[in-house]
Amino acid sequence: MKKHPASTLLCAASLLVTSAVTFAGTDTAKKEITLAPEEDIVVHPVTSPYYAEDSFVTTDIRPVFVYHNIPGNVLGGGNASVTAVQVRIKITDSLQFVAYKDGWLDISTPSLGNRGWNDIAAGIKWAFYRNDAAHFQAAAGLGYEFASGDRTVLQHDDSLRAWLSANKGFGKLHVGATFNYSWAMGNGTPLLGTSDWLSWHLHTDYQVCKYFSPLIEVNGYHTTRGSAVPFSAADVASISNNGSPTVSGAVGMEIRPFKSLALRAAFEFPLTHDRDIYGNRITVSSVVKF
């Protein structure tokens, strides 16, 4: 029987993360080659930059550019782009300040053609578990998105977000998962409504050499409460959803020309067929470490 490639990719990514959790307590490090501290050799999540948060506590700046091709059945088609800068500051070995959402949003469609500011969101991450021998880390976080952005670009929606993440290393192979839940607080006035939602994000990368790692990521978004607008902007804008999940897959890479600099890019595409804003997406970002 012919398998759907989207289902195969999703199952493979899920299997990798399930294996990471299952074997976190085993002695997997006996024959591994430890090249550097785990946070120095893994690739931080590239796609869904607002919500795919790993378990590592670092200090870095991450410029991000995202370009979307919007399908014709959403807002008449067109494109949207986001330009932003994320900041992460290590407070202690287990606490990190995360400024994960800001920037400038440009939406160009026949139905909506506007430019404006994103909402601003920030939070605290707590790395509550770390086992260096097993190459396993886990963290939790709490963040708040302030209704500071422009309604004309589908922002101005305040929300409370909680997340949980886990990461596991198998030598040069690294896998990770993040789970989020977001509650709309009702203090903003977004143009197309608000919603409560949960999301999950799977990541795997392989260190080919100290300069290069390919990666695969899968992102899923599920609305749990919201008005019945028949499409979802996932992590792009404040648009409600009628309950249909949005799942995307991505392939990409990271290049590390210097120890303190990583350059990344990924191409993202839908794995579900609901009417969402994922025609396809290109994410380009860098990580400047301090």
Label the model's feature ranges.
Residues 24-290:
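Transmembrane beta-barrel domains of Gram-negative outer membranes and organellar outer membranes
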Residues 1-38:
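Cleavable N-terminal export/targeting peptides
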